[in-house]
Amino acid sequence: MEYLLALDQGTSSSRAIVFNRAGQIVASAQQEFPQHFPQPGWVEHDPLDIWSSQLATCRAALEQARLGAADMAALGITNQRETTVVWERATGRPIFNAIVWQDRRTEAICERLRAEGLEDEVRKRTGLVIDPYFSGTKLRWILDHVDGARERAARGELAFGTIDSWLVWQLTRGRLHVTDVSNASRTLLWNIHTGQWDADLMRALDIHPSLLPEVHPSAHRFGQTDADWLGAPLTIGGIAGDQQSALFGQACFKPGMAKNTYGTGCFMLLNTGERAVESRNGLISTAACQSGSRRSYALEGSVFVGGAVVQWLRDGLRAIQRSADVEGLAASVPDSGGVVFVPSFTGLGAPYWDPTAQGAIVGLSRGTTIGHIARAALESIAFQSTALLQAMTRDAVSAITELRVDGGASANNLLLQFQADLLGIPVVRPEIIETTALGAAYLAGIATGFYRSEDEVARQWRASRTFHPVISRDEAQHRMAQWEMAVAQVRLPTTHGH
């Protein structure tokens, strides 16, 4: 049993990856599933599509590896966070589609909670803000809108879960109704300080306690899968939400270690150790993966438009044919020629929180070329990430020593060099950038004794390339000041003549 199987259940596809003991990928399979948009702002998945696609990828990955379930030491699960499922305990059938994390239908419920003055209490207890993003209001909406659901919940006939819980229920044919701390901490119902479901928050949202799963550490022997699914029973040893799993897969085990995932947006997590830091900069505090008896926390922030700015260069401006071409175009000029690109197409997120901000390209001159604009677009990803990381260090009151990176845009050397220059710390790209799935595998391995400790995993983590800062701190501060000036311009109250 020299292998680990990781299930990576994402927003648009399900994946399964077989890792060997060295954390290398032996085989992988991926399957997309349909997205449903019944109304503007609504996003749903059919939970049965999620389950069938996930099971199919497990079988395909094992087949590709020419291995069976009996060759796997354990199974780890990582998942899109906050997405909410309610199902019948007797049949395992969902009573409604899964309401996805992007879905905004619960804004009215959130507005009511804010009007009741609950914002401060929610932030203190959960580390989160009242927002449709999190699971609690989605669960409330399903109970309000499905006939008889609230009565059935009171009778103990229904179960709620995030995607990890739903998959484990199916994998064990209803024997286990569980989740881990990292997923529980995204529900608005879990108190990150007591490590328990919070009775007051459940009352505020009118949620019956019988709906909720049991919460365990992320690395834990949860139980075994039913032998019929994969030909032999498999120990479920790891569960974690995708961003926390990536932090674990990057071996960011000590306070002050941070990772940034450069995808369509950017997700940054900073390990704050055994301290849940209350942010003064609009970031959220969340449970990180727990692999032993000690609780672990992280600060989290996100940039709305990261790699998406490159898609806009391709599809909106038609400046490039493929996203990968951006690096060559940006490298055709020595710098951005004074151009600053603020890609606030959907407002500005942390640490600015300005939903009305619009995008802008500032500092154009007669000598500006498409190369300068491409370079400024890439630089915008690093500027936003730097502003966010600076807010994190102010909150955590401790310095970040290096930034570990993953995600699609982390393949871009120009971006990572500029990121290191702005931050003044090394930026490190690992050999294995499938860090989300790797985190789930590591957790499962630690729970089952396949790995002895986090230290063994940390020794295994390897850098592929480290980018060291080459510009002076004065120059970096000057560049950040240019960025902040450009941001101030997009936030000016605009006069459109009405």
From Swiss-Prot:
Top-level taxon of the source organism: Bacteria
Gene3D superfamilies, per database record: 3.30.420.40
InterPro entries found in the cross-reference section: ATPase_NBD, Carb_kinase_FGGY, Carb_kinase_FGGY_CS, FGGY_C, FGGY_N, Glycerol_kin
Gene Ontology biological process: glycerol catabolic process; glycerol metabolic process; glycerol-3-phosphate metabolic process
Gene Ontology CC annotations of this record: cytosol
Any one GO MF annotation of this record: ATP binding
Binding residues annotated for glycerol, in chain numbering: 81-82, 133, 242-243
Keywords assigned by UniProt, alphabetized: ATP-binding, Glycerol metabolism, Kinase, Nucleotide-binding, Transferase
Enzyme Commission no: 2.7.1.30
Binding of sn-glycerol 3-phosphate, residues: 11, 81-82, 133, 242
Inhibition and activation profile: Inhibited by fructose 1,6-bisphosphate (FBP).
Residue numbers binding ADP: 11, 15, 264, 307, 408, 412
Function as written in the Swiss-Prot or TrEMBL entry: Key enzyme in the regulation of glycerol uptake and metabolism. Catalyzes the phosphorylation of glycerol to yield sn-glycerol 3-phosphate.
Protein family: Belongs to the FGGY kinase family.
Protein name: Glycerol kinase
Species lineage: Bacteria, Pseudomonadati, Pseudomonadota, Betaproteobacteria, Burkholderiales
Protein's gene: glpK
